[in-house]
A protein has these predicted regions:
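Short basic helix-loop element that most often maps to the first helix and adjoining turn
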Residues: 89-108, 133
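Alpha-helix N-cap/N′ positions at the starts of helices
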Residues: 86-87, 111
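DNA-binding alpha-helical recognition surfaces that contact promoter or target DNA
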Residues: 44, 93, 107, 118, ...
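DNA major-groove recognition helix of helix-turn-helix/homeodomain DNA-binding modules
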Residues: 129-147
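N-terminal flexible/basic segments that precede or flank functional cores
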Residues: 2-86
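Recognition helix of helix-turn-helix/homeodomain-like DNA-binding domains
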Residues: 110-125
Length: 147
């Protein structure tokens, strides 16, 4: 999976001395807001909000990854989400769409539910063997999202 991007607009609020960032999705709608005393902190907060939102949507079987950009638009500042962020969201989405609980998925993989839950957390770094087993368990492609 290549990186995906969420461009954002930034505004400095003089009254509160904070940077306010508003993410814009691929349909140019607001997709997350964050504020902090520095752009870097606000960007990290926006990034965390976006990941939480994508995970929540995946829990409902909704694919919101398409709301992100495949390239950061020219002259834009963007939150960058990499494969280690996005692959767990894709795995969760596929599991939910197959109507499986984490426990049922773990059983198919021959691991504990706790070990499986780690695969669905952004930042996880599953090995190739694990990803192949996930693909087989879901009868769906996952590896194409890992590159």
């Amino acid at each position: 999976m290549r990186n995906l991007y969420l461009p954002y607009a930034k505004v400095f609020d003089k009254e509160t001395s904070t940077w306010c960032l508003t993410g814009r999705d691929s349909r140019r709608r607001d997709f997350g807001v964050a504020a902090a005393d520095s752009v870097e902190k606000a960007e990290e907060r926006l990034r965390n909000w976006v990941l939480d939102s994508l995970l929540s949507a995946a829990d409902d079987g909704e694919d919101r990854l398409r709301d992100l950009y495949v390239r950061c638009p020219a002259e834009a500042r963007c939150v960058v989400l990499g494969p280690r962020d996005l692959l767990p969201i894709r795995i969760r989405l596929l599991r939910v769409r197959h109507g499986l609980s984490q426990a049922a998925m773990a059983e198919r993989l021959g691991i504990t539910q706790q070990a499986y839950a780690k695969l669905e957390r952004p930042g996880s770094n599953p090995g190739l063997d694990t990803l192949v087993r996930v693909e087989r368990a879901l009868d769906a492609s996952v590896l194409e999202y890992a590159s």
